[in-house]
Amino acid sequence: MAERIFLEVNIDGLDPLISIRSLSVQQSIFAHHKFDLVVPSASIEPDNEKLFDIIAELVGKDITIDWETGTFKENSQGTDASSFKGIITDVSVYNERGNYMNVRIQGASPTILMDGVPNTNSFSELKLKPLYESVIASNLVNKLQAEDNLSYAEKIPFSIQYNETDFNYMCRIMHQCGEWFYYDGQTISLGVKTGKELKLTPDRTGSLHFGFNLSGPVAQVR
């Protein structure tokens, strides 16, 4: 039997959003995760005059998207539950077929906070975790705490961040040291952490969609 998906969205300052028209979460390994959520305007505020004041305050707020599968929610026991935490960056309102309004809420993973103005810095005699902490010092540190799952334990003698965003710099340095640097939907990981095995069976694959694409080469092949 195919399993149902139970979905709940929580935004700071609002009641949980249960009535969802559409939701997509795109999780990339080497880029910021993105989400796109559409809900009926009435699920946020039935009064249209108050609605615009409320949604104007949503940008910058934290959002948590929880979903789990099971034939019945009370029987799922959290055996296949996932959660995504992000930051709202865009909010818009549109009218659908002239009958009702929808609110579109878009955003990204907290790593987007590291992708601001390009910086130029130099670092010396630091291991990767202290280096990361130095890089994020000018950001909202509490939103960028990372788990240390590093294998590379050597100090980096000298490194230059030249006209790079903090995110691009850390991606480059971690790659040079043979380490992973990614967001798993809830926390930033320095290095690879051990996760639980997920088994895909024919009755579950209807709720999952995996895709791959091939992008162009970095340098032209002659």
Give each language-model segment a name:
Residues 106-209:
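Charged- and aromatic-enriched interaction segments used to assemble
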Residues 29, 55-59, 80, 127, ...:
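Short amphipathic alpha-helical segments
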Residues 71-74:
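Short acidic/polar inter-strand loop motif in beta-rich domains
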